[in-house]
Amino acid sequence: MADKYTPRLKGKYDAEIAAAMQAKFGYKNALEIPRIEKITLNMGVGEASQDKKKVTTAAAEMELIAGQKPVITKAKKSIAQFKLREGMPIGCKVTLRRERMYEFLDRLITIAMPRIRDFRGLNPKSFDGRGNYAMGLKEQIIFPEISYDQIEKVRGMDIIVTTTAKTDDEARELLRLFGFPFPQDAAEQQQAA
């Protein structure tokens, strides 16, 4: 019988990251060690109030990026200034867990982030205080699944990484060990030199 497939980052977490986190923060129980719970991708399509087809094309692009069919989000309230009615489609979102989450994370860190123009690392202040990290991308074409010739408009998206960490410091260390490119603090840079 063939061995079950394990994503690269899941194997890295089990082999290295969990032990490093336990050594640094001194967890007594293995279930206390923080892990990534889910990754949520959200794409708001502002021009969807005029043309409903824009949401379906955005959803198709997100499906290529995530490898999972997104849910179309609808407006909760009517807003006259935006010509928006309650129930109109205004975007799409997808929640990734388990293997798909680790595979997306691997593609994000190793392929997509290096393709961002003028990229100097992620903002270390984007944690929410409960160990979750939110980041925004300005263009979806950094993902290799999206062909530049076939897109109709460059769109951005929000990526929220939800962890089981209790504090931002634990979550920052967890994501750093996964390979998230946070710029080093000035004090850490002096120690490394």
Curated annotation (Swiss-Prot):
- SUPFAM superfamilies recorded: RL5-like
For the biological process aspect of GO, one term held by this record is:
translation
UniProt keywords, alphabetically: Ribonucleoprotein, Ribosomal protein, RNA-binding, rRNA-binding, tRNA-binding
Give GO terms: molecular function aspect only: rRNA binding; structural constituent of ribosome; tRNA binding
Superkingdom of source: Bacteria
What is the protein's known function?
A: This is one of the proteins that bind and probably mediate the attachment of the 5S RNA into the large ribosomal subunit, where it forms part of the central protuberance. In the 70S ribosome it contacts protein S13 of the 30S subunit (bridge B1b), connecting the 2 subunits; this bridge is implicated in subunit movement. Contacts the P site tRNA; the 5S rRNA and some of its associated proteins might help stabilize positioning of ribosome-bound tRNAs.
Give the family this protein belongs to, as stated in its UniProt record. Answer: Belongs to the universal ribosomal protein uL5 family.
Q: What protein name does the entry list?
A: Large ribosomal subunit protein uL5
Q: Which organism is it from?
A: Novosphingobium aromaticivorans (strain ATCC 700278 / DSM 12444 / CCUG 56034 / CIP 105152 / NBRC 16084 / F199)
